[in-house]
Every structure is written in C-alpha cells, then in structure tokens.
Amino acid sequence: MCSIQFLQRKCFFVFLLCISGGGHDLCGQNLIAEDTLSVTAIPSVADSLLVEQLCELGLPLYSITTQNRVEPPYTVVVAPSGCCGLTVVDNIYQPARLVIIQNNDTVYDTGDYVANTSGLRVKVRGNTSAVGFPGHTPYKLKFSKKIDLLHRDDKNYKDKNWVLLNYPASRDFVHIAANAIGRYVREDWQPATRFVNVVLNGVPRGLYLLSESVKDGECRVPVGNGGFILEDDPYWWSAEEAPMFPSKVFNPYMKFTFKYPDEDDITEEQINSISNFIYEFEDALLHGEPIEKYADIATFAAWMLCHDILGTADSAGSNIYFSKKDSLATSKLQAGPIWDFSGCMGKVPFKGEWSYSHYPDNYVNYNGELLKRDEFLIEYAKCWERVKNGIVETVLPEL
C-alpha cells in the first residue's frame, strides 16, 4: 500500500475516533464488582432512580431478570503451558426474562422462561472481555423463540442467538465502522448492531453493543446442510472435550473449533470429512500446488484487506472464521466474517503500516503462505481498486 493510501487510511481512522468522542468511555461508571460464583443482585434505591433516568435517554433499555435473581456464573481460567490467554469456564445458562423499554414504553416482553415457548437463557461469553471488565461482562442471549431484536421487515432475520458486547466494543463506534467496512469490502454478511443500555436483576450494568452472532442462518452465514463454519481459536484449551483439530499452517497454540455443526450434534464422520478437506487445502498451499479448487481466494484477500484498513494489531487474528456452504465438491472454503475489533484503529499500540498478520513470524489466517502467491496478490489489488474510493462514504451513514 503506497504512502498516500496509508495517509488516507490514517486520516480516516483519526476522523472516526474524533466523531466517536475521541475514544472516551461511554460505559456506565457505577458498575458492581463480579465474583466467579453465583450471587444474588440486590438493587438499591439509587439503582432504581438510575433505571428511571436510563428509560428517558432514547436508547433501548434491556431489563433482564434471571430466575431468583441469580447472576450468570463463571470461573476465570489461565491458559496452560504452550497456550495463550485468559478465558472463562463454568459459564452456564441462567433462565431469564427480558423486557425492552424505549422512551418509557415497554416495546417487548419475553415472559418468564419456558423451554421452546417463552423467555430466554443468559450466560457470560467472551474471553479477555469477560475477564478484564468486572461488573460489565459480555453476555450471550438464547431465546426460546426466534426474534429480530433489530426490528427489520424480514422474518428471516429472526434468530434465537444474540450477544451483548461490553467494553471496549461499547466505548466508541469502532465496531460499527468495522462491520460496515467488512460488509463493503467483503460484499457479504457482517453482524448488525445497535447500542443498548442493560439492567440485570435491577442493577444498571452500563452501555452494551447488541449484535447478531456468527452462526448458520439464511441472513447470517448460510452454509446449510453439509456445510460448516470453523473458528481458528486460541482458546480451544478451555473446552478440551469439544471436537477440534489443529492446523498445519497456523500458530501451534491455535486449533479449529466448530461453530456449525454444533459441537453437541456433530458426528465423527463429519469431523473427519471437514478436517480432511482442510488438510488437503493446507497441503496444496504449503507445497505450492493450485488451491483454487479448495478456496475462494477473493474472500481471503478481502479478509486481509479489511484488517489492513482497520490496522488490526491482534496477534491472534481477531477471531478467524471460515465457512463452506455445502458438501459439494464445487463449493469452496471462504474466509470471514471478520469479528472482534478491540485491537483495531489504534486501540492497541502498533507502529506497522499494515495489520499484524503481515509480520513474518506470525501466521494469522493463511496470509503468510498466500502472500507468496501471485493469484492472491492479484485478488488483493483488485479488491483494493474496487473499494478504495468508497470507504468513507459507505461507513459514515452507519455511524
């Protein structure tokens, strides 16, 4: 990327940070401390007054009440030798009820939890984000019935699975801008989001970013029967009994885990079929053989360009997803969607002019091998030429 283009990119980052309030924290300040055990939240009079004030702000207020007001439990664990990171385990679902309030009006009420009928279940999600911000943990929401929390005019947007992203996702507009860039550059699905205030068991928890989750679905990642969604995951070690397999190319502390088929439903035959396909692709990649029959190279180029535009400094690749739409020999491995932007746009100190994936000692995605191939470089250049003049105009309307 030439110096002029680099300066354009940096100016774009500065502009986004300025309009987002210079990176100031937008989260609530009066957050309770959390434990790794189940506790009961007891709202105070001050909490009740603050909830009334939150109802008047105009943003949707998500009031979640768990059965018996039990906090969703979790335990923090440290990576074993040879692995990396912090994450949470024992993060089991708690039955709950959700009431959505906007402008002092109740616009939605799930009712109490009844399996497949009403309510939802809530659990703590995430890795570092779940550990580093006590009182403002991220959550996964699993509804008994499909719902579109973003109120769009297509029933296909309805889904049971949603997430509430905490700080740093909720502190500025970087995640919103990054998803807009992902949609524009990749010409494919990226999660839709919106800011919401969250009250859990009567206690205000601050500002969150409501987001669609990465999963199979007609309006998400439509892989269908016979297809798969994989994540190359540095946190595989937190669930060693789950199905997984290593890569021949990626850093050894990462392994492929399954997003679809679900780890509870996947068969040994499916695991073998999927891993064999990946290994055939990796062998061809490592030995300089043609890879076009295995991979949609344009999607890999777009994935890398997204992170170069964002200046991603995440050494683990910011959640690397792959998908294949069916079991037919004609369908190809695709890279994406992009996810996790806590290391983007200057949030992590980084002096490189590219994303961290260009570093020669860091194999993020398959970039180290792909950059040796003319066909990949051609696709990367084509993608840049297609998008370079429309990035700002595309992103601004979504902020």
Task: Give a label for each model feature.
Residues 29-117:
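Regulatory N- and C-terminal appendages and interdomain linkers associated
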Residues 53-57, 89-92, 113-116, 131-135, ...:
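Extracellular/periplasmic catalytic domains that process cell-envelope and extracellular macromolecules
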Residues 99-100, 105, 111-168, 267:
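Conserved oxyanion/phosphate-binding beta-strand-loop segments in alpha/beta enzyme cores
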Residues 142-148, 156-169, 187-191, 203-305, ...:
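Internal "kinase-insert"/substrate-recognition segments embedded within catalytic cores
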